[in-house]
Amino acid sequence: MKPRRSMLFIPGANAAMLSTSFVYGADAVMFDLEDAVSLREKDTARLLVYQALQHPLYQDIETVVRINPLNTPFGLADLEAVVRAGVDMVRLPKTDSKEDIHELEAHVERIERECGREVGSTKLMAAIESALGVVNAVEIARASPRLAAIALAAFDYVMDMGTSRGDGTELFYARCAVLHAARVAGIAAYDVVWSDINNEEGFLAEANLAKNLGFNGKSLVNPRQIELLHQVYAPTRKEVDHALEVIAAAEEAETRGLGVVSLNGKMIDGPIIDHARKVVALSASGIRD
């Protein structure tokens, strides 16, 4: 499976970006019908995204749509449009509880049945944006087999906490809570956006923090951030060589019917082998010096 490190937000009302965003090289494009779209443009943006999702050039890249919350006048209409158009994943903003996911899942399944899509083919992502969402992160992450990822969204979260964006200290607990919930549920976790697009040094510092904590990637707001993020997540040649040795040792042990895998006198267990396979998968997109 192709790694999903970068998810690039594309404003749903920006027809020019909708028609070209597949060329930027992000692992996934995330059409935004929520915060990036004004109230008067909601209907137009929904139609533009509906049309973009059906374009042949988007068939080779993962598509995600951030809909409006279901308790707004726009959320259900967004969902009807994007599921019928064949979106790969729906991102639900402001997810506070497992019930939010259950409601979303019920609507998605109904729409799939009505339009003839394979039931279960539309994946879900929960965006956690409040103290309540952080507290309920584990139950949210386990709420549905459709849920492929959870993401932390910083702006609403820090507002809810009565603080503001700073050096990252204000997000540390939430990051750890979301990560632990994702790992317990066996799904991916995505870090917050870095909105200061001209501060490359700051972006790289936060991207390295996200990687070192264990996030699978980040949501992005500018195409210039894609290659920077991919370089952060790219393994080194030494890491790739070691991973290949681990995989070879595991395959040899399996061929010989051995129950124990060892490499250079050290025992190798399942998690190490799984990690090696992930390193090799990442290396297909580039290797750092």
UniProtKB/Swiss-Prot annotation:
Source domain of life: Bacteria
GO biological process, one term: acetyl-CoA metabolic process
Binding site for Mg(2+): 129, 156
Keywords: Cytoplasm, Lyase, Magnesium, Metal-binding
Residues that coordinate or bind substrate: 66, 129
GO terms of molecular function: citrate (pro-3S)-lyase activity; citryl-CoA lyase activity; magnesium ion binding
Residues making up the signal peptide according to the UniProt record: none
Spans traversing the lipid bilayer: none
Names of required cofactors: Mg(2+)
Claim: ATP-binding is one of the keywords in the record: no
Enzymatic reactions: citrate = oxaloacetate + acetate; (3S)-citryl-CoA = oxaloacetate + acetyl-CoA
One cellular component (GO) term of this entry: ATP-independent citrate lyase complex
Listed InterPro entries: Aldolase/citrate-lyase_domain, Citrate_lyase_beta/mcl1/mcl2, Citrate_lyase_beta_bac, Pyrv/PenolPyrv_kinase-like_dom, Pyrv_kinase-like_dom_sf
Pfam families according to UniProt: HpcH_HpaI
EC number from the UniProt entry: 4.1.3.6, 4.1.3.34
Compartmental location: Cytoplasm
SUPFAM superfamilies xrefs: Phosphoenolpyruvate/pyruvate domain
Gene3D superfamilies the UniProt entry points to: Phosphoenolpyruvate-binding domains
Assembly and oligomerization: Oligomer with a subunit composition of (alpha,beta,gamma)6.
Family recorded in the similarity comment: Belongs to the HpcH/HpaI aldolase family. Citrate lyase beta subunit subfamily.
Function: Represents a citryl-ACP lyase.
NCBIfam families: citE
Protein's name according to its UniProt entry: Citrate lyase subunit beta
Organism for this UniProt entry: Klebsiella pneumoniae
Gene (UniProt): citE
